[in-house]
Curated annotation (Swiss-Prot):
Catalytic residues (UniProt): 118
NCBIfam families named in the record: PRK00121.2-2 (NF001080), tRNA (guanosine(46)-N7)-methyltransferase TrmB (TIGR00091)
GO CC annotation terms, alphabetical: tRNA methyltransferase complex
Entry annotated with the keyword Isomerase: no
Chain intervals for the UniProt region annotation (Interaction with RNA): 124-129
Source taxonomy: Bacteria, Bacillati, Bacillota, Bacilli, Lactobacillales
Binding residues for S-adenosyl-L-methionine: 44, 69, 96, 118
GO molecular-function terms, A-Z: tRNA (guanine(46)-N7)-methyltransferase activity
The name this protein goes by in its record: tRNA (guanine-N(7)-)-methyltransferase
Listed Gene3D superfamilies: Vaccinia Virus protein VP39 (3.40.50.150)
Entry EC number(s): 2.1.1.33
Gene: trmB
Keywords tagged on the record: Methyltransferase, S-adenosyl-L-methionine, Transferase, tRNA processing
Length: 212
């Protein structure tokens, strides 16, 4: 999600260390200690303005959530939502999520969410897609055995590519939704993009893939 630079974004992030972890590499292997409990940890790579991560945290108080985004302005808007919601089970990371092993130990994360990731439609940019093999390698490392990746997109090309990528990697497709909002799936928490696209009648695709 690209947004204009927000004046004061850096200062806002730095002023809220209770939610924004500025040196996440130091927390590697210690995230439950940082949260102050032994609850499972779920992360969202590319958390945007925070609608999904705050909604999930509010609905599931016994799960810890970490939202990751490289854009400080976007993350500052997510922080606004966190502060307004006042949920204790969220941390935000202002980092590049290309190698999550820099921040999380093996098996430290229970579940990973990819919501409306950049489709990078050109073939020469395939390696930048978050469901490309090299990303799956890092996801598998920080997730436990049978760890899950939950993926949503409005881009059919990326969806089909991801189904193939997951399958070729040897992952089990636990669930596939070709039109999420027309299905009987319960508990869906919308992202900002999802709210925008679905209101225009855009089909939303979803898959739950499990490492074997």
């Amino acid at each position: 999600m690209r947004v204009r630079n927000r004046k004061g974004a850096t200062e806002l992030l730095e002023a809220n260390p209770q939610y924004v972890v500025l040196n996440p590499a130091d927390a590697k292997g210690k995230w439950q200690e940082l949260f102050g409990n032994d609850h499972p940890i779920h992360i969202e790579v590319g958390s945007g303005k925070g609608a999904f991560i705050t909604g999930m945290a509010k609905a599931n108080p016994n799960i810890n959530y970490i939202g990751i985004d490289i854009q400080k302005s976007v993350l500052s808007y997510a922080l606004d939502k966190v502060l307004a919601t006042d949920v204790p089970n969220i941390k935000l990371l202002w980092v590049d999520g290309s190698d999550l092993t820099n921040y999380f130990a093996d098996g430290e994360i229970e579940r990973l969410y990819l919501n409306f990731s950049d489709p990078w439609p050109k073939k020469r940019h395939e390696k930048r897609r978050l469901t490309y093999k090299s990303f799956l390698d890092t996801f598998k490392q920080i997730l436990p055995e049978k760890g899950e990746v939950h993926f949503k997109t409005d881009n059919r090309g990326l969806f089909e590519y991801s189904l193939v990528s997951f399958s070729q990697y040897g992952m089990k497709l636990k669930g596939v939704w070709l039109d999420l909002h027309a299905s009987d799936f319960e508990g869906n928490v919308l992202t900002e993009y999802e709210q925008k696209f679905s209101s225009k009648g855009q089909v939303i695709y979803r898959v739950e893939a499990v490492f074997q």
